[in-house]
Amino acid sequence: MSFVLGIDTSNYTTSCALLDTADMSVRSCKKLLPVKQGERGLRQSDAVFHHTKQLPELMKQLFDKRYDLSAVGYSYAPRCAEGSYMPCFLVGENVAQAVSLACGADLEKTSHQVGHILAALYSCGKLDMLSSDKPFAAFHVSGGTTDLLLCEPDKAKLINITQIGGSRD
């Protein structure tokens, strides 16, 4: 029995989860980043600070005992696109790399956007769509943007994403 740790440190939420590969069950912990009343979001430096404080607390909740980790995954950027970068994702990346090295677990990176799509497929019992030849459409609503995405299963990257529509916000 092995487990996969997932970490996401977006500009809104600190998240971590454990996937039990034996039964595909998931335990997760998450905490919103504090935004002062009347403000619309956080500066990246503030998001990094809050993730640095919150992630160890959440990992302590998640790891109620010792787990045999086979892999550690993390979000490295908002999207899998040239120039897609936010410093807040460095916190999750650094923790994921440290845990991976300490446990001898594989290290896997993906985008925040792909993470949302995978979470949606998991929660509706449709992970089998990843092993199909058929493309599918997905809406990604996150961080003040709404995107209509064409998702094509890919053995190497899991999903190739092409934005085919979206909001102008």
Q: Model-predicted segments: where are they?
A:
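Short acidic/glycine-rich loops and adjacent helix/strand connectors
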Residues: 1-169
